[in-house]
């Protein structure tokens, strides 16, 4: 079935969707949990953390595992461990080819990531081939996003589309966009934004996703990989 609305822009999440940083998050968090005799992190917990701003995710981990540390201490540990591994992250299957294809077709593309600027640079400085293709990049610590308004709120997508419209002097509407996501909070935020959602969960997450059809509610598609995207279905 062909998508009923012409797609005029594509907006992307980053972690676990374009690059394999979700696996690095799991590795480093398990190292932190092991220090306190806790863990390992299981997908029923991780699925609720995906796409959340760092402080909110950290708060939930501390509460769930009853860690005897403050949020600042937790963050300090994780940042130190993660910074050693970001340089090893790589594009997930189909991601780089999709970005190149959309650029070739002159489809405006925005990156809207919950990662802050520091983490974004650490994760992507060796992957310029793909990230230099974006027309605009919005990070989770952008001051224009009010505190407490990260995913599942739609603000980051609204800001990404606003920047695309300003750059190209267009008036693209949310329902003329596709949002690409891997996490449940991100899917909820994309739906609240009003876009069609391409949901590509981590392969190990499928057992804990719940009722995916109810979550998408006819406003999206679940794929096992970005390689499975049928461009013709969306007029791309």
From Swiss-Prot:
Q: Which reaction does it catalyse?
A: XMP + H2O = xanthosine + phosphate; psi-UMP + H2O = pseudouridine + phosphate
Q: Name one GO molecular function term.
A: XMP 5'-nucleosidase activity
Which UniProt keywords are listed? Hydrolase
Keyword Transmembrane found:
no
In short, the EC number is: 3.1.3.96
Source organism's superkingdom?
Eukaryota
The family database entries (Pfam families) matched by this protein are listed as: HAD_2 (PF13419)
Residue stretches in coiled coil: none
Of which family is this protein a member?
A: Belongs to the HAD-like hydrolase superfamily.
The record's annotation in NCBIfam families points to: HAD-SF-IA-v3
Q: What does this protein do?
A: Nucleotidase with XMP as the best in vitro substrate. Low catalytic efficiencies of YKL033W-A observed with XMP and other substrates suggest that these could be secondary activities for this protein, and its primary substrate is not yet identified. May possess pseudouridine 5'-phosphatase activity and together with dTTP/UTP pyrophosphatase YOR111W might constitute a pathway for the detoxification of pseudouridine 5'-triphosphate (Psi-UTP) and -monophosphate (Psi-UMP).
Protein name per the record:
Probable pseudouridine-5'-phosphatase YKL033W-A
